[in-house]
């Protein structure tokens, strides 16, 4: 039986940390930035962790489970 392939879309969007948590980037930072405040754009720049409710689905797409 062949190996399971990782979902390409998930591979591009998520990174694994050293402790096993999953990092992601914020949405809403690609265009129409003129109406968004500097504070909001700066906050959207930083990456964050995937929520616990979504962690299992992301791990399944990355074939970590």
Curated annotation (Swiss-Prot):
Keywords: Ribonucleoprotein, Ribosomal protein. GO terms for molecular function: structural constituent of ribosome. NCBIfam families: rpmI_bact. One of its GO terms (cellular component) is cytosolic large ribosomal subunit. Belongs to the bacterial ribosomal protein bL35 family. This is Large ribosomal subunit protein bL35. GO terms for biological process: translation. It comes from Christiangramia forsetii (strain DSM 17595 / CGMCC 1.15422 / KT0803) (Gramella forsetii). Pfam families: Ribosomal_L35p (PF01632). The keyword Ribosomal protein applies. It comes from the Bacteria.
